[in-house]
C-alpha cells in the first residue's frame, strides 16, 4: 500500500476516534471502542476472504441474514495469523489503558459541557463529509495511488486499505442512469422485436437448473483422478443427441449465487453494475421485468424452487416481484434427503419431477440447488468422498477431493433426471449450468501442480476461473450444437 493510501486510512481512524472522544470525553474509552471495532471488522474480513475469496463489501451488510444461515457450516480455525492478531489486539488494549486522558475540565455546568461536546461532534461532520466526498471522486486514481477500477474487490481492498476501499465502494449503493438512457428509447427497442405465437399444446416444459457451485476444475490445469467425477455430464458436453452445450462465463466466483440468478432471469449483465454488488439486495425493490413475466404471457405456470431458507438473498421478495406463480423453499419440499447438511441434488430433482407431473399447464421451473454449497472440510456420516485428485508434484486436499466427490453426486442425479424425462411423453427442455466455481482454497492444488500462482493470475487464467459448464437438453428432436462459449 502506498503512503497516500496509508494516510487516507489513518484519517478514517482519527475521525472515528475523535467522534467517540467528543462523546465520551475519555481517550481510553475512545481507543477501546476503536480497537474493538477494528478487531471485529478485521477478523470478519479475514474469514470472509478465506471462505469466498472476496472482502466485505458495503452491500454485504444487506446480506447479513443470508450469511448467518450458512455460517454454522464453516469451520472457523484459529490460525497462527489470527493468534498473532489477537495478541497484538490485547497489547494495544493494555497500552490504551495507559492513555487515560480526559476532555479538558470546564468550569461551566454539566449541561453546558454536554452542549460543547455535541457542538464538536456536529463540527466533525464537516471534515468527515469532505473526506467521503474526496473518496467519491470518479477521477481519484488520476492523482493518487488509489485503485477505483472495481476490477476485483480483493485487489482494490489490498491496494487501498479496507476502510478507504469500503467507503469508495459505498458510492455505488445507488446507481445512476447511463448517459442517453430513457424509458421511451428502451420501449422503442422492444417494440421493434417480432413475437411468435404458439398454442399451449406446442409449448414444452422448461426446467432451468442452476446447480450450486457446479464446475469442471480441469479447465484450470492438468490433473487426474481415480475416476471421472462427471462422466455423464461430460458425455452431454462432448456432443450428445438433442443437446446444446458449452461453457458459460459467469460474473461471480466462490459465492454471490444471486448474481448468476439475476443475470439469467433478467437478461441484464453485472458488467453494468458495481463490482461486488448484489442486485437482489440493492436494486430490485419493485416490479422487475424478467423471463418469468414472458413465460406467464405465453401460458406457462411459473415455479421457483430452492431447497433452503426462503429469505436467503431476499429471494421470497424478489421472486414475487418477478412474477413467479409459486416459490417452493425448503419448508415446501416433500423430498428432503440430505447429503452433508443440504438437500441432495437427487432429492431436489425428484421434487422437480413431482412439480412437472402435477402441472396441467406447460411448466417453467427455475430451480436453484444447494447440495454443493461450501464449506468442504467438515466430515459427515452421510457423505463418503469417492473421488481423489492425483498430482505428480503436489498433494491434493480434503477440500478438493470432497468438492469433486460432490460433483460426482450431481452427475449421478442429472443422469437420473434425464433418464426419467426421456421416458416421459411430455415435451421437456432442461437447461443446466453452474452458478460459479468454488473458492481459491479448494482449487489451489491444481494451480500448484501446474506451476501457476493463484494470487497472480493472467487475464486468461482469470477468465478460466469464471467458467462453468452448461447444457440444454430436450427429450425430443432439436438441433445439436457443442463447444459454445457464452456469458
What are these regions (language model features)?
Residues 1-153:
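Transmembrane and membrane-interface helices of multi-pass
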Residues 5, 52, 58-61, 74, ...:
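Membrane-interface micro-motifs in multi-pass membrane enzymes
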Residues 72-75, 80-81, 85-86, 181, ...:
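Membrane-proximal soluble helical/coiled-coil segments
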Residues 194-200, 210-211, 216-487:
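Solvent-exposed soluble domains appended to multi-pass membrane proteins
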Residues 125, 149, 156, 232-235, ...:
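Alpha-helical scaffold segments in carbohydrate-active enzymes
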Amino acid at each position: 500500500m502506498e503512503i497516500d493510501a496509508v494516510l487516507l486510512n489513518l484519517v478514517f481512524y482519527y475521525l472515528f476516534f475523535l467522534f467517540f472522544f467528543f462523546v465520551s470525553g475519555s481517550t481510553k474509552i475512545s481507543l477501546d471502542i476503536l480497537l474493538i471495532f477494528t478487531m471485529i471488522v478485521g477478523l470478519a474480513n479475514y474469514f470472509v476472504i478465506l471462505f469466498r475469496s472476496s472482502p466485505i463489501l458495503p452491500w454485504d451488510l444487506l446480506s447479513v441474514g443470508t450469511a448467518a444461515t450458512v455460517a454454522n457450516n464453516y469451520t472457523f480455525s484459529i490460525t497462527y495469523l489470527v493468534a498473532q492478531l489477537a495478541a497484538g489486539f490485547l497489547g494495544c488494549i493494555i497500552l490504551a489503558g495507559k492513555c487515560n486522558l480526559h476532555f479538558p475540565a470546564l468550569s461551566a455546568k454539566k449541561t453546558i459541557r454536554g452542549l460543547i461536546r455535541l457542538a464538536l461532534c456536529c463540527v466533525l461532520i464537516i471534515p468527515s463529509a469532505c473526506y467521503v466526498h474526496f473518496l467519491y471522486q470518479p477521477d481519484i486514481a488520476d492523482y493518487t495511488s488509489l485503485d477505483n477500477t472495481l476490477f476485483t474487490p480483493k485487489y482494490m481492498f489490498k491496494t487501498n486499505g479496507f476502510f478507504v476501499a469500503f467507503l469508495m465502494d459505498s458510492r455505488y449503493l445507488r446507481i445512476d442512469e447511463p448517459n442517453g438512457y430513457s424509458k421511451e428509447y428502451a420501449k422503442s427497442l422492444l417494440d421493434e422485436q417480432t413475437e411468435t405465437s404458439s398454442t399451449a399444446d406446442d409449448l414444452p416444459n422448461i426446467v432451468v437448473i442452476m446447480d450450486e457451485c457446479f464446475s469442471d476444475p480441469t479447465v484450470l490445469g492438468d490433473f487426474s483422478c481415480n475416476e471421472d467425477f462427471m462422466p455423464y455430464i461430460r458425455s452431454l458436453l462432448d456432443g450428445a443427441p438433442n443437446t446444446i452445450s458449452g461453457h458459460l462465463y459467469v460474473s461471480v466466483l466462490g459465492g454471490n449465487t444471486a448474481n448468476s440468478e439475476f443475470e439469467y432471469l433478467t437478461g441484464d449483465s453485472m458488467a453494468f453494475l458495481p463490482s461486488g454488488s448484489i442486485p437482489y439486495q440493492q436494486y430490485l425493490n419493485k416490479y422487475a421485468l424478467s423471463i418469468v413475466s414472458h413465460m406467464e404471457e405465453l401460458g406457462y405456470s411459473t415455479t421457483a424452487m430452492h431447497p433452503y431458507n426462503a429469505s436467503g438473498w431476499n429471494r421470497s421478495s424478489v421472486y414475487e416481484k418477478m412474477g413467479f406463480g409459486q416459490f417452493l423453499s425448503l419448508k415446501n419440499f416433500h423430498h428432503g434427503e440430505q447429503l452433508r447438511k443440504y438437500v441432495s441434488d437427487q432429492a431436489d430433482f425428484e421434487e422437480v419431477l413431482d412439480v412437472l407431473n402435477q402441472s396441467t399447464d406447460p411448466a417453467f421451473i427455475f430451480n436453484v440447488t444447494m447440495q454443493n454449497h461450501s464449506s468442504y472440510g467438515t466430515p459427515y456420516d452421510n457423505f463418503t468422498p469417492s473421488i481423489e485428485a492425483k498430482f505428480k508434484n503436489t498433494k491434493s486436499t480434503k477440500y478438493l477431493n470432497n468438492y469433486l466427490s460432490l460433483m460426482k453426486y450431481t452427475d449421478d442425479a442429472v443422469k437420473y433426471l434425464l433418464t426419467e424425462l426421456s421416458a416421459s411423453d411430455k415435451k421437456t427442455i432442461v437447461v443446466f449450468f453452474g452458478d460459479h466455481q468454488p473458492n481459491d482454497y479448494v482449487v489451489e492444488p491444481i494451480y500448484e501442480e501446474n506451476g501457476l500462482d493463484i494470487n497472480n493470475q493472467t487475464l486468461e487464467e482469470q477468465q478460466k476461473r469464471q467458467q462453468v459448464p452448461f447444457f440444454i437438453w430436450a427429450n425430443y428432436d432439436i438441433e445439436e450444437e457443442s463447444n459454445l462459449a457464452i456469458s
